[in-house]
Amino acid sequence: MSIARITMMEYLSEKDVVASENFYQTIQKDWFGNAQAIINVRTGPTSLLSLAVYSSYADAESNLPKRKEFQGIVKDKFTIVDSFYYEGDITDFEASKAKEIKAEWKN
């Protein structure tokens, strides 16, 4: 069963959110390439929610060292105020209109 890891991050400024997202784009495939899907959502001017889907708990745990490294970088370099995550089994998933989803990347 696939699992989801939901990470919440709160930054000091909107500038830090943008810089962190830009940095994330440069490492995502190398550091978190084992994710089946990743959706990042700006939940406010200084906050970000990241939803990552993995094939199993073992697969999700395999990138925890890189996640810890990423969290350290964003804490020091981009002034992250708070960060925590939840994870659990995916109990329902509907993506019949996945091709209609539009993502806008802001630099």
Predicted feature locations:
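Short S/T/G/P-rich N-terminal loop/turn motif that feeds into the first structured element of a domain
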Residues: 1-49, 55-69, 76-107
